[in-house]
UniProtKB/Swiss-Prot annotation:
Residues annotated as binding Mg(2+) 1: 91
Binding site for Mg(2+) 3: 226, 230, 234
Signal sequence extent: none
Protein name: Sesquiterpene synthase GALMADRAFT_104215
Entry's family note: Belongs to the terpene synthase family.
Gene3D superfamilies, A to Z: Farnesyl Diphosphate Synthase (1.10.600.10)
One GO biological process term: isoprenoid biosynthetic process
Binding sites annotated in the UniProt record for Mg(2+) 2: 91
Function comment: Terpene cyclase that catalyzes the cyclization of farnesyl diphosphate (FPP) to beta-gurjunene.
Alphabetic keyword roster: Lyase, Magnesium, Metal-binding
Amino acid sequence: MNTTTRTFYLPRLEDTFSVFPDNGLNPHYAECRIQSQAWIDKYYKIVCGPKMRAYMDHCKFELITAYTYPYASSDGLRKTMDLANILWLYDEFTDTLSGKDATNAAAIVIRTLRERDFDDGSWICHMMRDFYAAHIEKFGPNVSRRFIDHFCQYVEGTGTEAKHREKDHVLDINAYIIMRRAASAVLTAFDLAEYCLGIDLPQYVHDDPAFISGYNAGLDLVFLDNDLFSYDMEQAKGHCTTNIITVVMKSKRIDLQSAFDFTAGYCESLTQQLIAAQISLASRTDPVFSNNAVKCLEAIANWVKGSDGWSFATERYFGKQNVIVKETRAVEMRKSFQDIAVLKE
């Protein structure tokens, strides 16, 4: 397995995702971003130094919601932005922790979401209490239940990932996908898609095989696409053991570029799986499936396409080279920790 290559080429997945409609950007982005930044900044000030705060501002985390929820109202978009800011901050914070400390942080989140009178005085607890009061209480009962379950799964998963990083443990492909599905933050983003559509799907829809097929295809596409973009940053941090590229290189015994190409091919298959699920559900006689469930899968497809588009609009992955990388697809791998802001700087 050749790992010495210092340049790799990203696939053009926007061509693959061109089968999904382009619904543009949400028109409420500018106003909602100001509101969401003002809210999350009080927690950034506690956790991040000025260099990291400047870096995260350049990443334009709120912009991803304008790409992925173009149909959302101002109220809905604000909810998605607050969630995005929580997820990015929590992800950066737990990346610096040991497996034990990440597990302890997860326990605080879980107790805060499940025990309404819990307050240990920590910034994590207060951030989640704020989000619950401002947003979760407004969700429908099914979306609310799933959101809390999914968020708890996500934070538990950060502890698991941290333990894998500590041990340099690389899963096989199937085990990796199962782990990511079970504990992906994208699950919570999909829950908010339901809310923004004004839909509260009954659980039997989420348990339907055709819906599961489309839902999982969209979920896999989002985190695999993200793995492609984040690989260079993660290898520079020493965190690439929990990235599909490392997983594929080890499992298939292939080189770096071949792993990118393999993953791109898998994404093409998943795209067709998502489309097939929409067609299947649209043929049902029950409007809960033929209308509401299809709308939710369309929103998931929008998430896939929008997330891919945002990844080149942000400086999150390639810094000031983002436009050049979009044009050339060439990524020159960074040396360890080069240009990576440290949390407390």
